[in-house]
A protein has these predicted regions:
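Metallo-beta-lactamase
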Residues: 39-90, 98-107
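Short, low-complexity, polar/charged sequence segments that are solvent-exposed and flexible
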Residues: 17-19, 33-37, 67-70, 87-91, ...
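Binuclear metal-ion centers of metallo-dependent hydrolases, dominated by the metallo-beta-lactamase
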Residues: 1-5, 84, 88, 93-133
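Core dinuclear metal-dependent hydrolase active-site scaffold
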Residues: 1-63, 129-133
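Hydrophobic/aromatic beta-strand patches that form the interior of the parallel beta-sheet core
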Residues: 15, 67-69, 96, 126
C-alpha cells in the first residue's frame, strides 16, 4: 500500500498514513512516501499504528482514534516530549507507547505517561513490557 491508499477486507478497513522523519539529521532514516503508518477500523473502533515516524502533521490531523500505538526512540522516531505533544493534539482514548528501547533517557515511558496524563484526563496511557529482560 502507498500513503493514502485504503482497502477493506472481511469488514476491516485499512488506511495507509504517511510516516517519516522531520529532523534534518534523521530525514534519510524514513523518507516521506517510503513507509506507512496505518488506521485500522472495524465495527466503529479505530486503531492507529504510527510506524517509525515523528510528530508529523498527518498524525496531528487524526480524529476519532480509539487506540494509538506511538513510537519514541531517537534517532529513529521522536523524543518523548514530541510523542506526548502529538498524542495531546489528536487525543486518542488510549495510547500504547512502543519502540522505546533506546538510549538512556531518550525513551522514558514514565515521563511520556506523566506528560500525557498531567495534560489530559481523557487519554489513558497503557504501558506494556514490550522488552522484558
Amino acid at each position: 500500500m502507498n500513503n493514502g491508499d485504503s482497502l477493506t477486507m472481511a469488514g476491516i478497513e485499512i488506511r495507509a498514513i504517511p510516516m517519516y522523519n522531520l529532523r534534518e539529521e534523521a530525514k534519510d532514516l524514513h523518507v516521506k512516501g517510503r513507509g506507512n503508518g496505518y488506521i485500522i477500523e472495524r465495527d466503529g473502533t479505530r486503531i492507529y499504528i504510527a510506524g517509525d515516524t515523528e510528530d508529523i502533521p498527518e498524525m496531528r490531523d487524526l480524529k476519532n482514534i480509539d487506540i494509538a500505538f506511538i513510537p519514541m526512540n531517537l534517532p529513529y522516531t521522536m523524543p518523548v516530549e514530541a510523542a506526548a505533544d502529538a498524542v495531546l493534539e489528536f487525543k486518542p482514548k488510549k495510547v500504547y507507547p512502543y519502540h522505546y528501547k533506546g538510549k538512556e533517557g531518550l525513551s522514558d515511558v514514565g515521563k511520556f505517561k506523566n506528560i500525557v496524563e498531567t495534560n489530559s484526563v481523557n487519554i489513558e496511557v497503557v504501558q506494556l513490557d514490550w522488552y522484558p529482560d
